[in-house]
Amino acid sequence: MNAAAAPTAKPKSRAESAPASSRERMIEAAISLLRATGLTGAGINQVIAASGAPKGSMYHHFPGGKLELATVALIRWGERVAEGLAAQLAGPAPLPDKVRGIFEGTARTMAHAQYARSCSVGAVSLDLDEETAALAPVCAGIFASWQAVLAAAMHGIPEPRRDALARFVISSIQGAQVQSRAARDNRYLVEAGAIVAALIAQALEESSHARENPAGQPHPRRSRKGD
């Protein structure tokens, strides 16, 4: 997922407007670097340079080093996106339109960033190896949290299909981001959004029809001439 799903920033209080702590600056720098370069470009030196934090503060705030910082940054991004998804899905528009809007918003965000950034969770997932395997369940848990938000919004669709559709939405948007970034063309996201929206509309229609015509219920007998 991308910044398009993040919630709109609220006006900051005086306390919130104070300079961010070195820990917060490192977390935000890590998020930005992970979105741009994955794990390979989000090393300790890169985070320190991007955040402007004192070098000695890294292990003070994150004794586990790069992996601990990456974990915190991923979870922060995951929560941010989940909040944004929930806000977008809570609107009054039909569900297929809202889901298509998520894809289209992500497409606009990627184009605005000149395809230099995508989803930090997706980028890290593609970089995982034996040394960073501890991040695999972190990424999987974040994907699952986004899927849960989507599934909860699919009112009227039975749970097994609802869950499968939610997983498919995440898979589609992640794959479309990879293709869009490679081709520097956001049409992959726009096209995927239209197809996913059509599938959700079909699922809603079929679920509604199934409720109106439960299995085993005889269809009303059509009248014939002479009856």
Regions found by a protein language model. Give the residues of each.
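N-terminal intrinsically disordered/low-complexity leader segments
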Residues: 1-21, 206-227
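N-terminal positioning helix adjacent to the helix-turn-helix/winged-helix DNA-binding module
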Residues: 15, 22-29, 66, 165
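Generic hydrophobic, amphipathic alpha-helix propensity
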Residues: 22-30, 47, 73-81, 150
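Helix-turn-helix
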Residues: 25, 33-72
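Short hydrophobic clusters on alpha-helical segments that form packing/core surfaces
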Residues: 26-34, 106, 173
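Amphipathic alpha-helical packing segments from all-alpha helical-bundle domains
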Residues: 82, 97-101, 115, 130-156, ...
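Hydrophobic alpha-helical connector segments
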Residues: 85-117, 166-169
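Amphipathic C-terminal alpha-helical segment
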Residues: 109-112, 126, 130, 170-188, ...
